[in-house]
Amino acid sequence: MTNRLELSGIICRTPLRKVSPSGIPHCQFVLEHRSVQEEAGFHRQAWCQMPVIISGHENQAITHSITVGSAVTVRGFISCHKAKNGLSKMVLHAEQIELIDSGD
């Protein structure tokens, strides 16, 4: 089964860095995406806020250079997580994060 997602946007919540009891580092943040997409010959506004998690030692270097307001492209897969309130939420498990140059 295919499960791939690539999403660009702005980090809108402060990245939360944790280390699991087994020693695996995790970084969680929320990515806000806004764009105009074409559907059935019409332009429509696309918007979402997607929780993102990136795990593992090899991926943590990039997480220390991202902050609220950073523009990034995230590639990975999606999965459901159960929130503390018992509701399910979709989460993007990042395998790759690229900073988008703002041109400043």
Swiss-Prot record:
Gene3D superfamilies, sorted: Nucleic acid-binding proteins (2.40.50.140)
An example Gene Ontology molecular-function term: single-stranded DNA binding
Any one biological process term the GO annotation gives: DNA replication
Positions of the SSB domain: 1-101
InterPro entries tied to this protein: NA-bd_OB-fold, Prisomal_replication_PriB
GO cellular component entries: replisome
Superkingdom field: Bacteria
Keywords linked to the UniProt accession: DNA replication, DNA-binding, Primosome
Assembly behavior: Homodimer. Interacts with DnaT. Interacts with PriA. Component of the replication restart primosome. Primosome assembly occurs via a 'hand-off' mechanism. PriA binds to replication forks, subsequently PriB then DnaT bind; DnaT then displaces ssDNA to generate the helicase loading substrate.
Function: Involved in the restart of stalled replication forks, which reloads the replicative helicase on sites far from the origin of replication; the PriA-PriB pathway is the major replication restart pathway. During primosome assembly it facilitates complex formation between PriA and DnaT on DNA; stabilizes PriA on DNA. Stimulates the DNA unwinding activity of PriA helicase. Binds single-stranded (ss)DNA at the primosome assembly site (PAS). One study finds it binds 15 nucleotide (nt) ssDNA. Another study finds the minimal ssDNA length for binding to PriB is 25 nt; prefers dT(30) over dA(30). Also binds 22 nt dsDNA.
Family: Belongs to the PriB family.
Protein name in the entry: Replication restart protein PriB
Gene that produces this protein: priB
